[in-house]
């Protein structure tokens, strides 16, 4: 059918919206089951995700890109996580972000929102944003909501200019 021809930037948006609708049907028994939080890492050089409700810039954290041995790795690797989190700012940022989310989420629920997309961005979307996205996901999944994680730009080659 014609729906198979969709090949633009809306594809991931449509996929996520479809997944959220399906999850509402199957997870709807839980009290907050139909409120879906997506924590999304991305690279600013590839554009801010159009469906992000909140966007946080983590380019202030130590950048492993400049360490030759670390460059090919991602924020899913322990050595990258240790590098990004080494000076304590990453943990403090996660503490503040978790506190902010615990304040905001009940208020978004009161407004009738059924999903929240939190974008975490660094330059390329491979190291710092992935590390912080993983950290925020680990904290938010303890809350009584459906929480999803997505790393949009993790596979993009750091040497590639543009998309």
Model-derived segments and spans:
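Conserved GTPase G-domain signal focused on the G5
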Residues: 13-22, 46-48
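N-terminal start-of-chain detector that recognizes signal peptides
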Residues: 9-12, 25-31, 90-93
């Amino acid at each position: 059918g014609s729906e198979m021809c969709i090949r633009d930037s809306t594809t991931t948006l449509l996929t996520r919206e479809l997944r959220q609708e399906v999850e509402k049907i199957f997870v709807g028994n839980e009290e907050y089951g139909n409120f879906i939080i997506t924590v999304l890492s991305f690279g600013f050089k590839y554009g801010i995700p159009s469906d992000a409700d909140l966007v946080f810039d983590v380019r202030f954290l130590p950048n492993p890109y400049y360490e030759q041995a670390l460059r090919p790795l991602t924020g899913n690797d322990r050595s990258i996580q240790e590098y990004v989190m080494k000076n304590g700012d990453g943990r403090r940022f996660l503490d503040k972000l978790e506190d902010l989310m615990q304040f905001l989420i009940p208020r978004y629920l009161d407004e009738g929102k059924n999903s929240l997309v939190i974008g975490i961005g660094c330059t390329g979307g491979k190291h710092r944003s992935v590390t912080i996205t993983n950290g925020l996901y680990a904290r938010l999944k303890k809350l009584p909501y459906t929480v999803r994680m997505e790393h949009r730009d993790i596979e993009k080659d750091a040497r590639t200019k543009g998309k």
